[in-house]
Amino acid sequence: MQASIESTGNLERRLTFTLPQERLETHVGGRLRELARTTRIKGFRPGKVPTKVIEQRFGQQVRAEAMEGLLRETFDSAVREHSLRLAGNPRIDQGETDFDFVATFEVVPDFGDIDVTTLSVVRATAEVTDADIDQMIENLRLQRRIWNPVERGAQAGDLVALETWSQAGDERLPADGVETGSSVLGSGVMFDQIEKGLEGLTKGEEKTLSVDFPAEWRVPQLAGKTVQVHVKAVEVSEPVLPAVDKEFIKSFGVKSGDAEQFRADIRTNLERELKGALMNRLRREVGEQLIAAYAHVEMPPRLVENEARSMLAQQVEQVRRSGRDPGQVPADAHQGFMDAAAKRVLVGLLVGEVARRNELRLESRRVSDTLRLIASTYEEPEQVIEMYRNDPQLMNGLQSRVMKEQVIDWIAERAQHTEQSLSFQDAIRV
């Protein structure tokens, strides 16, 4: 195989290689003969279709498939021959002839000696207590609450239906009429000064509040200004929570309505949530330590840019899913994600290097356990497991996640670490 490599940048390489034409022709010929034996074409007996007919009908497709397979195989072989470790996917262009190709790609930087024993990691620990279960049951009751109108003044926990309009200098918002909405006092949904101003209001009562909006406020006409906000309490309602009886318990999938089973199910769910939260904390902690230790290492520019664009796309999609219009996204919007992307790429490449150098292998048992854990959050766990097993893309994503968790654990076990005991609520807080 003819192949040559040249450096076109600190981390960019250009690989020029030639496909072995005789291998391509051999593969194409063999595939066409196989099709001649197995293909049924009207007017010809099975296995007696002339080669010329087979070539006219399938030749172009067979050649394209063979070329694609041989291209991938030849490139991979050249990469192994030159001991290259790619960072991201290559761009492969046609060379001077149909069999010449030029691949441009970035390589993994040299991290030198990766000594994880010098890292200092804080490993958080926590457990689910009866008080956490009680709090979750209270949260479930709040989800099922109903509202009863009251004549007294609004207080914390009440739902206040509102009509509002604002005066910012010479500008009235809205220009005509009022805006309607509602807020539960103490929920923090509304601006703090407005929410505090609603306390004590009775049905039909009006009030004008002087509100100082911060410069970064989401409404440009109000940002950085002292605004007169006129509010009217259309209605004040207090919450009525359901009793924790059999019917309430059954509504959450516990068919027996048994209180102890209900608490056991809640504990299982909270422990699953806690396990994920502690892993995320550990992953973040290890990542921060790796970034601090290897921030001096140059990252592949194109890989970082691609990661930044991916992060931007995820944010735009989140905005769209929330029902908001992301608007026109500037061509250079990804620049705001470049620092975060560089850190993410650094951690990803380092984790891969640690796995490679220490010959860490994916644990199939851990993959199965993680899959069962994911499936247990759905009503039909077995269907979810089957869906993953029949979808290579889903399984690849799961395996990548598990492999990263394995490496993070491996690093944390060998790093200098101290334990930090947290409450359940603190542990799951982002």
Swiss-Prot record:
Record InterPro entries: PPIase_dom_sf, Trig_fac, Trigger_fac_C, Trigger_fac_C_sf, Trigger_fac_ribosome-bd_bac, Trigger_fac_ribosome-bd_sf, Trigger_fact/SurA_dom_sf
Enzyme class: isomerase
Principal subcellular localization: cytoplasm
Subcellular location: Cytoplasm
Record's keyword terms, sorted: Cell cycle, Cell division, Chaperone, Cytoplasm, Isomerase, Rotamase
A single GO BP: cell division
GO function term, MF aspect, one: ribosome binding
Reaction catalysis annotation: [protein]-peptidylproline (omega=180) = [protein]-peptidylproline (omega=0)
Pfam families named among the record's database cross-references: Trigger_C, Trigger_N
This protein's GO CC annotations: cytoplasm
Domain of life assignment: Bacteria
Gene3D superfamilies tied to this protein: 3.10.50.40, Trigger factor ribosome-binding domain (3.30.70.1050), Trigger factor, C-terminal domain (1.10.3120.10)
Occurrences of domain PPIase FKBP-type (ranges): 157-242
Signal peptide residue numbers: none
EC number per UniProt: 5.2.1.8
Function as written in the Swiss-Prot or TrEMBL entry: Involved in protein export. Acts as a chaperone by maintaining the newly synthesized protein in an open conformation. Functions as a peptidyl-prolyl cis-trans isomerase.
UniProt note: domains: Consists of 3 domains; the N-terminus binds the ribosome, the middle domain has PPIase activity, while the C-terminus has intrinsic chaperone activity on its own.
Similarity section: Belongs to the FKBP-type PPIase family. Tig subfamily.
Designated name of the protein: Trigger factor
Source organism: Xanthomonas oryzae pv. oryzae (strain MAFF 311018)
